[in-house]
Swiss-Prot record:
The chain crosses the membrane at residues 33-61. InterPro entries: Prot_translocase_SecE_dom_sf, Translocase_Sec61-g, Translocase_SecE/Sec61-g. Coiled coil: none annotated. It comes from the Eukaryota. It comes from Gadus morhua. Belongs to the SecE/SEC61-gamma family. Residues 62-68 are extracellular. This is Protein transport protein Sec61 subunit gamma. Pfam families: SecE (PF00584). GO terms for cellular component: endoplasmic reticulum membrane. The keyword Transmembrane helix applies. Residues 1-32 are cytoplasmic.
Length: 68
């Protein structure tokens, strides 16, 4: 019986902690959601521009190396 409790107790504690976490979580309000969405959009745009410029720079370099 003691061995069974050794396996059951960590699971029980995990479920208890998970329920407590879900109860404490709150949905963001409209202003907070817009701020997070704007920050994410700006991050995507910056990464896109970086990728575009890296590609733009490496195309001519690749053509010179390959000898096109």
């Amino acid at each position: 019986m003691d061995q069974i409790m050794q396996f059951v107790e960590p699971s029980r504690q995990f479920v208890k902690d998970s329920i407590r976490l879900v109860k404490r979580c709150t949905k963001p309000d409209r202003k907070e959601f817009q701020k997070i969405a704007m920050a994410t959009a700006i991050g995507f745009a910056i990464m896109g521009f970086i990728g575009f410029f890296v590609k733009l720079i490496h195309i001519p370099i690749n053509n010179i190396i390959v000898g096109g």
